[in-house]
Amino acid sequence: AIAKLPMDEVSRMKRADEMGYNRDAYHGSTRDIREFNTVFGNREGHYGANHYFTNSVDDLGKNYAGEGPDLTQRITEKMERLGDEGIEPSRKAAKEALGIENKGVSYPVKLKLKNPVKTHGKDETFFDYQAKYDEDPSSDYYEEFLGEEGKFIDLIDDTKRVMRNWNVDDVDGVMAKLQDANMDMEGISASQFEDVMRNNIYDLYHPETGQMSSVGELIADVYKTMGYDGVEMGAYKAFGPQKRGGGRWGGEGYMTKGMEGLDQDTLHYIAFEPHQIRSKFAKFDPTKS
């Protein structure tokens, strides 16, 4: 007879850790989720139609467990689009189109992120760059340029390929902005890369579905192409209070309010594939990893 797996919490969490599901997180949804997919994913989300999680119960309660700011905006936009399509724009119709089935449920999960891009945090991913020269020992002035290497080169190559696949209007202009961001010739951070992309690409449509999409989904495609399996984001630095104004224009500027429910330790996780996500109450059967 096949021995049954012990189902006490200690045994399940031990198996979860051994299988790589070692990050505790929460997902807030107005859908009754049996398994994760992107059917009702928001292509205009910060990283497009991927899977979003937080490590903070406070963040979850304030922003994601019900009709928080993001979902309220999506409902309003959907109502406007229904009207454009000749359908009576009601909240009920918009909710049905968005797959909203309840008033908000919190899902505790275990995530398997082996190689996430880290952004807006203390140890964020850095795409390094090195220019290689062969110094002529007989000359104090002559150096032969041998080439370039580093993660920045991979980033540039993969970004160009993905942008062309997405039919971005000004690929060369965006590439020039990325090169400008590497002015010190040492490389750029993930947040610097994202700032350039988000500030210089507009009016995107998904190459497969034709749906309007966010620059974030293109960014996620770049990360996937480079071999990353998700994103770990310092949410407070990304979405907390931000300074506006001042700087070289003079004056003290001002601080925006930012999202509620965040603190310096709040992390947002974005998983690219459904198999990276398991309910905290799953069996964690090694034969079904």
Residue ranges and their predicted role:
Residues 1-289:
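Active-site and NAD+-binding cores of ADP-ribose-processing enzymes
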